[in-house]
Amino acid sequence: MTHRVDQEYDYLFKIVLIGDSGVGKSNILSRFTRNEFCLESKSTIGVEFATRTTQVEGKTIKAQIWDTAGQERYRAITSAYYRGAVGALLVYDITKRQTFDNVLRWLRELRDHADSNIVIMMAGNKSDLNHLRSVAEEDGQSLAEKEGLSFLETSALEATNVEKAFQTILGEIYHIISKKALAAQEAAAANSAIPGQGTTINVDDTSGGAKRACCSS
């Protein structure tokens, strides 16, 4: 979802949070949008979203962050919300190996439903629980590189790298949008320079000295 608006913000970007239930997606959302953390947060039911407006290279970007439930029974519901997303944060819990093992399944589902140009970052969350770690940071980095994703370890509790993760995603999206806009402008300029394109005004002399304007394209 990329809308151009001239009042409150320049662009609206839809970003989805995906990953297994319990990896901390809701707290990542609340940390980024409200700078809050809830120790007793419950599992998301269905889909929730929140927004935050931020600056990217002088442009005002409104980030619309969708928190998609990780439970199996909501998968059919959440798949519909991939449509229109231009960014995704794929989250696993560094203390639970199974959530990391499921990353490829989430990635496959995302790529099946989302736009092929979607910007994806993988985040190993709960880095504050390093003493309980079951997924090495190198494993996360290696998988991300293999799949062509950005990667960070985050802590919603300590607010570590949460801001950086979203700013990186938003920055990459903005660069893609800017390149597309520039390419479109260059294509339009090239087309206008080609003879025979557009509207031509022909002025013909008539026998009475009057002039007639004929439009042809």
Swiss-Prot record:
Residues 195-217 are annotated as: Disordered. GO terms for biological process: protein transport. It holds the Pfam family Ras. Its main location: membrane. It is found in: Endosome membrane; Golgi apparatus, trans-Golgi network membrane. A motif (Effector region) lies at residues 41-49. One of its GO terms (molecular function) is GTPase activity. It is a lipid-anchor. One of its GO terms (cellular component) is cell plate. InterPro entries: P-loop_NTPase, Rab_GTPases_membrane_traffic, Small_GTP-bd, Small_GTPase. Disulfide bonds: none annotated. Signal peptide: none annotated. It comes from the Eukaryota. A lipid is attached at C214, C215 (S-geranylgeranyl cysteine). Expressed in root tips. Keywords: Endosome, Golgi apparatus, GTP-binding, Lipoprotein, Membrane, Nucleotide-binding, Prenylation, Protein transport, Transport. GTP binds at residues 19-27, 38-44, 67-71, 125-128, 155-157. SMART domains: ARF, RAB, RAN, RAS, RHO. NCBIfam families: small_GTP. Intracellular vesicle trafficking and protein transport. Belongs to the small GTPase superfamily. Rab family. This is Ras-related protein RABA2c. It comes from Arabidopsis thaliana (Mouse-ear cress). The lineage of its organism: Eukaryota, Viridiplantae, Streptophyta, Embryophyta, Tracheophyta. The gene is RABA2C.
